[in-house]
Curated annotation (Swiss-Prot):
It is found in: Golgi apparatus membrane. The chain crosses the membrane at residues 5-25, 39-59, 109-129, 153-173, 238-258, 265-285, 299-319, 353-373, 387-407. GO terms for cellular component: Golgi membrane; trans-Golgi network. Keywords: Antiport, Golgi apparatus, Membrane, Transmembrane, Transmembrane helix, Transport. GO terms for molecular function: 3'-phosphoadenosine 5'-phosphosulfate transmembrane transporter activity; antiporter activity. Probably functions as a 3'-phosphoadenylyl sulfate:adenosine 3',5'-bisphosphate antiporter at the Golgi membranes. Mediates the transport from the cytosol into the lumen of the Golgi of 3'-phosphoadenylyl sulfate/adenosine 3'-phospho 5'-phosphosulfate (PAPS), a universal sulfuryl donor for sulfation events that take place in that compartment. This is Adenosine 3'-phospho 5'-phosphosulfate transporter 1. Signal peptide: none annotated. One of its GO terms (biological process) is chondroitin sulfate proteoglycan biosynthetic process. The lineage of its organism: Eukaryota, Metazoa, Chordata, Craniata, Vertebrata. Belongs to the nucleotide-sugar transporter family. SLC35B subfamily. It is a multi-pass membrane protein. The gene is Slc35b2.
């Protein structure tokens, strides 16, 4: 991208960097509270691990360590840098899905209800808690307004730790295909995963949750762009058409919705820049994971590898900033926050397992319909619980977005019915 474009974005964003929380007019306590400063500080922390690691990987590859290496560290270095390429084609086959003996229609309906309920409960609860944690205060009394939790990176760490534990236990308890990918390749998806999650949490300080949900729905556009750039993919005409409808619907919502109590042109700009960052990083994550599935790993193995590096990045960055203990002390001061953060992490981790199971049992089309309905319900709940305003034109924009999403499901289903079904592992979905 042209460097001048980035300069314009940064310069336009600078006036809004001090705005945040419930009072956009109030200046930040210090320049270290600016979201752009925190973002750059986080990136510097991740780079302090990733750059030396990448240089070490390139050095070992140039030195042909795979042929000359010896010693106790050799198996670890081989797994991290070179991977374990299977000797025979049979070894890379994914573990077959086992069909239950009870495959009657009533049993299928029960499984569908179970999957839909699990996805709805997990992600609706996650959405409500996310907005509560990032916009509410803790410890408020009649004489004190309480404290706001501000460290989005600490919340990302909590999510990733529990997801890592859940994925690790699943891999231990259920047989997985032989792992062949070099571990270091997960680090690229982990980095973009962490940055997208940070932008997602941070954006809630500046824009409403319904705005964020619609922004996520519109990420199909940058995903297609990244697919063109990263994977050299081609797309059908209906994909471009529905992407355009989504853009129109989101624009209708953003331009017509009433102002939020804490909003201003400055805070809105900050929120939109953060949402753009979330969409860009998340699009890269999806396409990089698609490329990694060439190693024939399972989705849970992908979940484990990405979350492993995400934990390493966030722990290292928090330690460098001295923020890890401060986040723990905030949890100690406010047990309600500790409970919310734990529930948020549980919903995120088990929601991913529901995603894998639903796609495995019913396919991506059914999963997409369930999640599209979840997004619509999430907007409704957020408006009811937190008092967000939506105008008639804004409501029509929401309807256009979800209509376009359902049209994509219908068109994709018609296209796939004309082809022979080929089982593929879905990319890891994250929140």
């Amino acid at each position: 991208m042209d460097a001048r474009w980035w300069a314009v974005v940064v310069l336009a964003t600078l006036p809004s960097l001090g705005a945040g929380g419930e009072s956009p007019e109030a200046p930040p306590q210090s320049w270290t509270q600016l979201w752009l400063f925190r973002f750059l500080l986080n990136v510097a922390g991740y780079a302090s691990f990733m750059v030396p690691g990448y240089l070490l990987v390139q050095y070992l590859r140039r030195k042909n360590y795979l042929e000359t290496g010896r010693g106790l560290c050799f198996p670890l270095v081989k797994a991290c840098v070179f991977g374990n390429e299977p000797k025979a084609p049979d070894e890379v086959l994914l573990a077959p899905r086992t069909e239950t003996a009870e495959s009657t229609p009533s049993w299928q309906v029960l499984k569908l209800v179970f999957c839909a309920s699990g996805l709805q409960v997990s992600y609706l609860t996650w959405g409500i808690l996310q907005e509560r944690v990032m916009t509410g205060s803790y410890g408020a009394t009649a004489t004190s307004p309480g404290e706001h939790f501000t460290d989005s990176q600490f919340l990302v760490l909590m999510n990733r730790v529990l997801a890592l534990v859940v994925a690790g236990l699943y891999c231990v308890l259920r047989k997985q295909p032989r792992h062949g990918a070099p571990m270091y390749r997960y680090s690229f998806a982990s980095l973009s995963n962490v940055l997208s999650s940070w932008c997602q949490y941070e954006a809630l300080k500046f824009v409403s949750f319904p705005t964020q949900v619609l922004a996520k729905a519109s990420k199909v556009i940058p995903v297609m762009m990244m697919g063109k750039l990263v994977s050299r993919r081609s797309y059908e005409h209906w994909e471009y058409l529905t992407a355009g409808l989504i853009s129109i619907g989101v624009s209708m919502f953003l331009l017509s919705s009433g102002p939020e109590p804490r909003s201003s042109p400055a805070t809105t700009l900050s929120g939109l820049v953060l949402l753009a960052g979330y969409i860009a990083f998340d699009s890269f994550t999806s396409n990089w994971q698609d490329a990694l599935f060439a190693y024939k790993m399972s989705s849970v193995q992908m979940m484990f590898g990405v979350n492993l590096f995400s934990c390493l990045f966030t722990v290292g960055s928090l330690l460098e900033q001295g923020a890890l203990l401060e986040g723990a002390r905030f949890m100690g001061r406010h047990s309600e926050f500790a409970l919310h953060a734990l529930l948020l992490s549980i919903c995120s981790a088990f929601g991913q397992l529901f995603i894998f199971y639903t796609i495995g049992q019913f396919g991506a089309a059914v999963f997409t319909i369930i999640m599209t309905l979840r997004q619509a319900i999430a907007i409704l709940l957020s408006c009811l619980l937190y008092g967000h305003t939506v105008t008639v034109v804004g409501g029509l924009g929401v309807a256009v977005v979800f209509t376009a999403l359902l049209l994509r499901v219908y068109a994709r289903g018609r296209k796939q019915r004309g082809k022979k079904a080929v089982p593929t592992e879905p990319p890891v979905q994250k929140v």
